[in-house]
């Protein structure tokens, strides 16, 4: 797991770091040592406005910014420095001290005596419990169990039409009574199903 923190979104932390003047550092450019006093601008918006208004237009350089965007202005202000005009180095004169190999000719050394230590602990706990309850479906509840029809065969005459049989064999069938009772019961079941629907 990696944790990345954008310092530009934490003005309260950075304000205590860049409020004071940092120690002077020594930069090396093309073999020349340059002493420079760097002063970080306060991230407070009001202080920055006073700083910009106190400077004359010709003294405002690329390192100064008048951006009103909080994130952009703070990001620029945290890196903005005031330098002396005499501390500049001409690139034309720097070519004279370049080594013949042209390897490692431009070197910049920068040291910052202040830093940020961030310690973050992330604890997470996820518990999932599921209960599976078996419930009878509506079909099972609505299903009705009808009694079983039992009938004995007999030889009694029952009134049956010839249309009930293809060849008129029902008149001589010994299961006429059973067939008739079954047919009446099937009609009752059909009517009951229609009412339920």
UniProtKB/Swiss-Prot annotation:
Localization of this protein: Host cytoplasm
Biased composition (Low complexity): 17-30
Pfam families documented for this protein: Rota_NS26
Cofactor: Mg(2+)
Chief place where the protein resides: host cell
GO cellular component assignments: host cell cytoplasm
BP terms from Gene Ontology: viral genome replication
Biased composition (Polar residues): 91-104
Feature: compositional bias, Acidic residues: 152-165
Residue numbers carrying Phosphoserine: 67, 153, 155, 163, 165
Top-level taxon in the UniProt lineage: Viruses
Subunit comment: Homodimer. Interacts with VP1. Interacts with VP2. Interacts with NSP2; this interaction leads to up-regulation of NSP5 hyperphosphorylation and formation of virus factories. Interacts with NSP6. Participates in the selective exclusion of host proteins from stress granules (SG) and P bodies (PB). Also participates in the sequestration of these remodeled organelles in viral factories.
Family in the record: Belongs to the rotavirus NSP5 family.
Protein name according to UniProt: Non-structural protein 5
